[in-house]
């Protein structure tokens, strides 16, 4: 009550924020006549003028009115679109590092150009982040015309680009791309071996389109770069055969749909043990014996695959592969795989080829990636429902931007039925009724399965319609273009919710593009375009009179934002429209989360088959259920962030140290320091402090010095000398080690040794970091059990992660020291037969292997150089026969400096440099 009274008297916080921005709008509008009087060349020169003024000390805020006026005029001339006043406010919100909530059809893409242009003037780059590759390409293509007119460059990051193309795109003033591509490029850059090979510049400003989808919906899913692990496909198949039998029996597992978890009952544990033993999968002993721990893991993942994941809802099988379906967009997520063996369990369930498991090499969550940007802003049609999360996690305020024209859409109360069959029958009845009026209809479903079920009903009734889901995603553009035509019926999964604009009468641009594809004659193209424009304008009037787009939702989603996205397809830019949701007691949201009393109360009302209940009370009850789900998901994301923050600080430290090593030409000082630390640790481990020589473990120390430092020293004789202590031993060992290193450097030459030192440090750093990530994954999976011992899992995780990180650094020092002490030059490669090998081109990055929350392929591990010890014995690799005369030392050193490791060797052997003469470096 008091809150409502305060809002009435003083306005909401959003109102006060808008007023502050609205005061600047007249200032921008006042500049319009003068800017319109400028020639194209004078308008373009304004960009140069703004840059010069920035260099002299002016601020971006100071330039804002003029820059916005220039961008607005350029847009009017080049794109034929002039920014409305409310769009100017949206641009100011984005520039301020906030989130602009703008209704569908209000021109978010155009709004972004204002903030993008202003912030690109600094020359530090602006990243515009979209949810898929199609939107990245489309927006970059459409808006590059504007930016080019203003003298700015535009790049776009999409899959399958080379490093050179990526570097060029990031060097542009404005770079478009998806959240996945930006994130993976960051991880890949931090796996490179030279600063020159990195593609990204230091971060400056990111503007995230559909910010709620990327920063909220996908926040819990980490980006992971991975390499191959052990193959256990046979075990997955054997366990799957057992679980198929198991799930058909009663009382063998407990399933919690709220938490999406499943556990074996005591009876189930005994039963699975019997089935595994019969199948010959279980080794001696019980299921939970230590040597069967891998089998337990496989059983758990197979059980999840069979009980929690449904084909055509959570994933589809396409071309013999299991492809994940994004629960928020309904789109296929090609290249992404579930981690921790779950994807392999699904492949076994569907009897397709089981891909190899992978091991994490590098990972980061979107939460931590986007917090790397000094300035972050975003835009979406639905953000206010998650305003608290944006503020708490990202320190971003949400500002609701008013529409340019009032919203005329009529939102009808939900209709709730007893069963799903009754619900879909009622939906079909309404579709038939509305279709006869000529009003276009968009029907939203939550899965492929349900969209095809409704399509089957409409087909039986002879009602023409289009289906848009992950199976028909190739036809998306043309289906969406026609969705606003008179009488059009479109059944869509959530994929129609984002990045699409359904215009009444049809989308002229999309229809023209589809109709003129392959037509080269300009006159013919113009004729086709004129005909389409005339038809669409006629259809627009017809649909407008019929009542606009009618949106029908067949189920409430867990998130109110997804429902609002669907509603928002209708009533764009002041158009008329309607929306209505049809629900049943069998819907997941009501069945799992809504009050149990709802079903009982409806049944007590004595509803007959086919009857529905419509009441605002039901809407409120459903909204409460959605809020509970959203709060639960928020808590889960916060919890994920707390754990990831532990590694995030370590990741920043590791990547910063690694970049420092890459930027340093001479690492001999670092090598010497690591060696000194290693020697001190060795001596202190074998010589107790302030002890007599008799208590020294000289034999153990001698063996370790020989193993790690490759030195045979008379340490036992030193111990007999008067006055000898641990410090004296350290000094002597260090002197001998330094002498040996100097001899190796003299033998190989200082320049070559510097290259080898850098290679050793970076490859060792990567190896120990990879092993640390694997250990951290294992720790994270089991840390929750500490709660049963009355200990805080998060604190336990922090303590153990710190201990593991310290141990990782110690391990790195020992490995680098051991490798450098055993390095030796090889005059020429051994004479193995020439083997024909395929090359992937001169790119160091493993392309196409990246996924969210899992991996999609193999990454070859860095190959050790000649004479290097490796963590595990490796079979000898085929080596080339040198062709022609061997290069001289000067040529070799030039090759080492200029030739990428994965490029073909300049000697002409046909092998990669790293497998040929690059073996020496």
Swiss-Prot record:
Biological process per Gene Ontology, one example term: protein transport by the Sec complex
Q: Where in the cell is it found?
A: Cell inner membrane; Cytoplasm
Q: Which residues bind ATP?
A: 87, 105-109, 501
Q: Where is region (Disordered) located?
A: 831-886
SMART domains in alphabetical order: SecA_DEAD (SM00957), SecA_PP_bind (SM00958)
Pfam families on file? P-loop_SecA, SEC-C, SecA_DEAD, SecA_PP_bind, SecA_SW
Cofactor(s) needed, names only, are: Zn(2+)
Binding of Zn(2+) occurs at: 905, 907, 916-917
A single Gene Ontology CC annotation of this entry is:
cell envelope Sec protein transport complex
Which keywords does this chain's UniProt record carry? ATP-binding, Cell inner membrane, Cell membrane, Cytoplasm, Membrane, Metal-binding, Nucleotide-binding, Protein transport, Translocase, Translocation, Transport, Zinc
One Gene Ontology term of the molecular function aspect: metal ion binding
Composition bias type Pro residues, residue spans: 872-881
EC code: 7.4.2.8
Provide the topology term for how it sits in the membrane. Answer: Peripheral membrane protein
Reaction equations catalysed: ATP + H2O + cellular proteinSide 1 = ADP + phosphate + cellular proteinSide 2
Question: Which InterPro entries does its entry note?
Answer: Helicase_ATP-bd, Helicase_C-like, P-loop_NTPase, SEC_C_motif, SecA, SecA_CS, SecA_DEAD, SecA_motor_DEAD
What domain of life?
Bacteria
Free-text comment on the cofactor = May bind 1 zinc ion per subunit.
Q: What does this protein do?
A: Part of the Sec protein translocase complex. Interacts with the SecYEG preprotein conducting channel. Has a central role in coupling the hydrolysis of ATP to the transfer of proteins into and across the cell membrane, serving both as a receptor for the preprotein-SecB complex and as an ATP-driven molecular motor driving the stepwise translocation of polypeptide chains across the membrane.
Instruction: Fill in the subunit field for this protein.
Output: Monomer and homodimer. Part of the essential Sec protein translocation apparatus which comprises SecA, SecYEG and auxiliary proteins SecDF-YajC and YidC.
Q: Which family does it belong to?
A: Belongs to the SecA family.
Q: What is this protein called?
A: Protein translocase subunit SecA
